[in-house]
Amino acid sequence: MRTTELVTCPRSVFDWLGPAGVRVVVIRWLRLVAADAELAPYLIGLDRPRLACCLTALLAVGLGGPGGGRAAGGVWRRLGLTDEQHWRVLDYLAAVLCGLGLPFDTIVAAQRAVAGEAPV
């Protein structure tokens, strides 16, 4: 029997990027934050590899990846950022994800997951 229909499986953005792709997104994101003159001082003395690991786990969940049992959100809030600075950090994430051509609702979901505003 011959089939002419294509079978598709719904895939999350995490499936397309994979763990290595999510790490690359986080590295680019942290570079943008570190290049911001107002935000860079908050990263001084911080264990950046550990921060990147936490952010990678949060972002992976926001993009449809496995939860890994980690608590969601608040990583940036603990640094003492103002609301405006916090939004700028999330805007940098949106810029990196937008550069990948991801849909708007996926970008917003990722921002919410990282900010701890949405159940993941």
Which residue stretches match the model-derived regions?
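Core of compact, soluble alpha-helical bundle domains
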Residues: 1-120
